[in-house]
Regions:
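Long, contiguous amphipathic alpha-helices that act as assembly "spine/axial" helices in icosahedral shell
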Residues: 1-15, 71, 157-159
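Compositionally biased, low-structure terminal segments
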Residues: 5, 12, 22-23, 118, ...
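Intrinsically disordered, low-complexity charged/polar segments
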Residues: 9-40
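Sequence/fold signature of self-assembling virion shell proteins
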Residues: 29-55, 69-70, 76-186
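Short gly/pro-enriched beta-turn/loop segments at secondary-structure junctions
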Residues: 59, 64-68
């Protein structure tokens, strides 16, 4: 839940370079890169995001050799995403994008039904970081000798834990707000 919250907030929240995590002006050396779009999910916008991640170079001008492997969508985009990633053919032509990433449909993204994210998760470093500071511990007050049970006939249950999520490497993520139609290549 924390990671998906960070993902959705990435269009506004800043990462280590002082820019929003998803931004059109990330600097690496003399080059400027974008990992942000406003295009609706389509074959064309998916290819654009894939190309964006795969084209990023490090500060010495060499490819980071990143290949995105996970498409994250809200339930409203599941059908479109499945067509892009799983269909043998689309509109009578071979789907060359089949199998280029795994699909994760995330209910927590339902509040933003047009957002979609393409991530590179196959490396040790990740685009988002989940930090478990204190493992969740479940407790209960259910014994007959507990005051709440004896006096009020109430059984209490609780959980205590600490964790957080934040931004890792923007180079490994591409996000879109899905506001405008992508132009078909022709």
């Amino acid at each position: 839940e924390l990671v998906f919250g960070a993902m959705m907030s990435g269009f506004n929240e800043k990462c280590y370079d002082g820019l929003s995590f998803f931004n059109t002006a990330h600097k690496v050396g003399d080059a400027t890169y974008s990992n942000r779009s406003n295009k609706k999910l389509s074959r064309e916008s998916y290819m654009e995001g894939r190309s964006s991640i795969m084209s990023i170079k490090g500060d010495k001008g060499k490819s980071l050799k990143l290949v995105p492997d996970l498409l994250v969508v809200p339930p409203a985009l599941e059908e479109t995403a499945r067509l892009i990633l799983e269909a043998d053919q689309i509109d009578g032509t071979t789907n060359v994008l089949k199998g280029t990433a795994k699909l994760h449909v995330e209910p927590a993204l339902a509040e933003h039904p047009e957002y979609w994210f393409l991530l590179c998760t196959n490396r040790f470093l990740k685009p988002f970081i989940y930090q478990l500071r204190k493992k969740i511990k479940f407790t209960s007050l259910t014994r007959d000798t507990d005051e709440n049970v004896f006096m009020l006939d109430e059984y209490l249950y609780g959980a205590d834990g600490r964790s957080n999520a934040g931004y890792g490497f923007w180079q490994m993520a591409y996000g879109s707000t899905g506001e405008v139609e992508a132009q078909a290549q022709g």
